[in-house]
Amino acid sequence: MNMKKKEKHAIRKKSIGVASVLVGTLIGFGLLSSKEADASENSVTQSDSASNESKSNDSSSVSAAPKTDDTNVSDTKTSSNTNNGETSVAQNPAQQETTQSSSTNATTEETPVTGEATTTTTNQANTPATTQSSNTNAEELVNQTSNETTSNDTNTVSSVNSPQNSTNAENVSTTQDTSTEATPSNNESAPQSTDASNKDVVNQAVNTSAPRMRAFSLAAVAADAPAAGTDITNQLTNVTVGIDSGTTVYPHQAGYVKLNYGFSVPNSAVKGDTFKITVPKELNLNGVTSTAKVPPIMAGDQVLANGVIDSDGNVIYTFTDYVNTKDDVKATLTMPAYIDPENVKKTGNVTLATGIGSTTANKTVLVDYEKYGKFYNLSIKGTIDQIDKTNNTYRQTIYVNPSGDNVIAPVLTGNLKPNTDSNALIDQQNTSIKVYKVDNAADLSESYFVNPENFEDVTNSVNITFPNPNQYKVEFNTPDDQITTPYIVVVNGHIDPNSKGDLALRSTLYGYNSNIIWRSMSWDNEVAFNNGSGSGDGIDKPVVPEQPDEPGEIEPIPEDSDSDPGSDSGSDSNSDSGSDSGSDSTSDSGSDSASDSDSASDSDSASDSDSASDSDSASDSDSDNDSDSDSDSDSDSDSDSDSDSDSDSDSDSDSDSDSDSDSDSDSDSDSDSDSDSDSDSDSDSDSDSDSDSDSDSDSDSDSDSDSDSDSDSDSDSDSDSDSDSDSDSDSDSDSDSDSDSDSDSDSDSDSDSDSDSDSDSDSDSDSASDSDSDSDSDSDSDSDSDSDSDSDSDSDSDSDSDSDSDSESDSDSESDSDSDSDSDSDSDSDSDSDSDSASDSDSGSDSDSSSDSDSESDSNSDSESGSNNNVVPPNSPKNGTNASNKNEAKDSKEPLPDTGSEDEANTSLIWGLLASIGSLLLFRRKKENKDKK
């Protein structure tokens, strides 16, 4: 029993013990959490006191400095990173808009990037106005670190081997300054503005932020900070330094210089190590912005090093733990820098020197501040020399009467620049104006740096009013109501934070000259901002308003012109050609053509050509040419053609041609010809014909013909014929003819013929004939010709042709032609021709022909004929002749005139017809054989 009780008691005692342990554990966790919260609050509040101690270079603050750089990278500070990220995003409007002194038509200068540098900006807080939009911890954190310049905000940023990883200001800032939560101070001092008043603005903004957390001991946080790093400036290798600028820098025209750096980091570098970049005192890194900041060096999306500006204006970079895990780290950096108005007050040559360690770069530039604007006795110039977009303030400095002229009843007005969406607020609540008198014009600095202590403050003696919205007015109220010395007017104003416009101001000086003529002179200032990129800079330019009474002339202000001339031309051409040609060409042509051409040609030509042509053509051609030509051509042509041609030609030609032609042609041709001809012809003909012929012929002919003919004919013919023929002929002929014919005929015939013939003949003939013939013929022929021709022709033709030809020609031609043609041609030609022709013809023809012929002939003929005919009047029943060489079977509906030799003439006509049909059949067969191949 007792044993059981003991066991029961022991179990109960054990249960009570477990519960006690659990309760105690929970209470312990609660106490620990409370202490951690207190520590967090203390660390932020302690930054406030630490920021002031940093000015005395406390040793503990130096040892804590490295933590400023990389806490964001650490995973153990996640909550701090979030707060800081929110802070920097809220500070977006206050990012590094480094602007140079700005004047008329100010231009925005974005930060240039070289090498691997990527342009970006960071948005760390400078003033309580921005930090109030962040979380409580981050807010107090940034407020206290403003004087420590741990914020990393400037114009450019360099990435290590990652030029493509450009980040905007918001992203960069989320990875910075978290370390200030645990780092009360830094070994770098606050950024120094070149203007004493700038310092006041920044310090005042910081000090107005009252800490919300209770203070605690500095040692409590310093114990957690790592020891200070080593200056490894002289251990950097492959250091490059460059100064990029023109030979002249115009500070009041957005002028600046670029400082370029590159280096390799030793593998022994660790987190907290630093290096130093020396910046010449003649430059500053802020332009006209109120504070100067430098970019962090980024490696992709990680911070490699953070930078601050020390009291001497040099840049100190501190490495993060990125270098602990990487070897062969390389970096490039580009920073824009501006001429410092305090250290460079006059126009002149300045030598700039910058470097990393023992590696330096030097460059001498001419600093040109340019002169004020002057109009008669009025002179004025202004500049916006300070912008604080965090507090939405600006400062404008205006030189009134810098020339020291006598101005009677002077009045200065300030307005928003006309025709702009200026964001300035000009009224009694938002604008403060100071006026200083300058006894000697030589005391004015050309850089517009003003030390108020050097001049007499006459603000209380002048009359300052705001007569209209967004306008102020300054009346100088001198005893004699005139000024003879310069005055400085300093305007401290505000910017409308809700406006999307840029800062644009106009200052105007009014006054009388000694002739009591009222005049005015204006000066415009403008600054444009580029959020998240670089700087905003201005361009100075005087503006002369319209004058109520103007005896003199105003020098015109040059304007910029923007022109974009453009021409559109397009051509579609596919050609494969090999050509060997020598040509002398003189041409006078006006042409309007649209062409689509596909050609493959091999051509060997030597030509002499003199041509004057006017041509209007639209052509579609597909050609495959192999031509060998030697031509001398003298042509004067006027042609208007519309042609479609498909040709495949092999030609070897040697031609001399003299032609004067006017042609207007529209033709469709489909031809297949094989011709070999040798002819000498001298003809002078006048023909006027109107024919309608419908023929259907199939001809297959094989002919051997040896002809030698000399023909001298002079004919005038006027014929009107209608012929309809259907012929089938099969002939085999051998002909050998030698004919001399001399005919002079005048014929006027009107014939209608309709013939249908079937002939099969085999003949050998040797004939000598004298014939007088009157014929109208419609023929389809294949010819081989060698001709010399001299022609003068006027032709008007409309043809459709499809040709396949192989030609070799040697021709001397002289032609004068007027032609109107519209052609569609599809040709494949192989021709061998040698021709000498001299012709003078006037022809006007209108023909409709449809022919289909089937003929097969084989003829050998040997003929010798001599004919001497005298010309008789038309319609004469006797001795009427037709000098035509055409062969045609005709069935006359009217009795033919008595020629005196009917049997012999009919026999010759029949044999000629048979020979013609035979040749047609022969060449048709050749064509079919060729097509089959």
Swiss-Prot record:
Compositional bias per record (Acidic residues), positions renumbered to this chain: 547-565, 599-861
Subcellular location: Secreted, Cell wall
Sites of Pentaglycyl murein peptidoglycan amidated threonine modification: 899
Motif (YSIRK-G/S signaling motif): 9-20
Keyword vocabulary terms for this entry: Cell wall, Peptidoglycan-anchor, Secreted, Signal, Virulence
GO biological process, alphabetically ordered: cell adhesion
Motif extent (LPXTG sorting signal): 896-900
Pfam families: Big_8, Gram_pos_anchor, SdrG_C_C, YSIRK_signal
Propeptide positions: 900-933
Record's GO cellular component terms: extracellular region
Residue ranges of the region described as Disordered: 34-200, 529-904
Family: Belongs to the serine-aspartate repeat-containing protein (SDr) family.
Name of the protein this chain belongs to: Clumping factor A
Record organism: Staphylococcus aureus (strain COL)
